[in-house]
Amino acid sequence: MSFTAYRLPPTARILSLMRIARTTLLAVSLASAVGCRDARSRAAAPTVVVSYAGSLAHPFAAALDEYARRTGVRVVTQSAGSLEAARRITELGDVPDLIALADEDVFASLLVPRHVDRYTVFARNRMVIAYTPSSRHADALDSASWWRTLARPDVEVGRSDPSLDPNGYRTLLVLRLTERQYGEPGLERSVLARSPARNVRPKSSDLVALLQAGALDYAFAYESVARSAGLRWLALPSSIDLGDEARAADYARAAVRVAGASPGDSITVHGAPIHYALAVPLRAPHAAEGERLRDFLLSPIGRRLLTQGGLDVVSAP
């Protein structure tokens, strides 16, 4: 069987092409109109800006997604070390609608009463030593003498910047508590010698990739971060891990000085159990949205999502 190609007469071809052109133009116009409406809809959607500690990135992800899904609010996030996040408010006037920090004392020291009138503690954590299967001398790591492993000359230790991130000054507090408890003069200095400037990052969550890439053998981390990243970690004794509420007085015997609210200022930070807190700043551009998001995070569903994200969430206030 053979087929014969059929060609339209010239006039018919022209009319057919004109119909196709009109149909295409109509489709493009409709798509453009829908796109414009979508763009206008996105622009008109309520917005809430959230600034949070780097160690909250994973726990907050699902909770913020769920809030956006339920409310249609556009959630814009900023992640930084808690001290840096606070100074964006005090020094730059960059005020979010909600701020969540890894140390409640940052609120008390830098933000209350000029920038925040009240804050709510919502989670706890503890310090650990994070590592990977390829970390040097990991087989020798134990909770009774971990610092000796970290102080070996071929070991690379990571930590966060104590002037930007609470994990950084908590690292120093852990070392000072350990030195005091075990009577090991020079312990802090010997461990920090394995953590030169190249191993220091603005926030503790930045150390995860370096550990996974083998650039670091060990890092001072929060337990929640090590768990969510799939890292191995060494649990420290409760006398030094800043995770035991009953040991608050013992932790307070260690102290470090860090930069304050403005250039040239400094504050003294004492050891304390690790508490996360959040607040709506006084000059929040979208304060009502910030309050609604705060209430969602503190609600039973919000707390459940944060717990699933690896946080040790405290009981409702």
Cite the ranges covered by each PLM segment.
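Serine residues within intrinsically disordered or low-complexity segments
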Residues: 2-3, 16, 32
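Short, solvent-exposed loop/turn segments at the edges of secondary structure
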Residues: 124-125, 273
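Short beta-strand-centered segments that line the small-molecule binding cleft or hinge
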Residues: 92, 96-103, 107-121
